[in-house]
Amino acid sequence: MVKFKALYKGMNDDLKDAEMMIDYACEISKHEEDKALADEIAKYAQYRLEHFMTFHKLFENEASKEKNVDKETVSGCMWHETHEMFQHWYDDIERKIKKYS
């Protein structure tokens, strides 16, 4: 289960950092002289959001290899809950980044 833990932690860190960076970019962009810096920070937020999807696909692939992955199994339940939580979080960050742009 180490592989699931590693992928989960990576996805969690990607979303946490993406959200933090876009929030910083929004705050920094309020100062016209810092707009270029804010733009770079926003690009980094976008990169972390994109990287989340890379790990998400890897997680999906690994979960699909597990026998009897469904809501009745521990791994199936974990997958369902994790996927739903991350999807909502991802959507919120994506909206922030689009609003920034």
Regions found by a protein language model. Name each.
Residues 1-101:
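Non-heme di-metal
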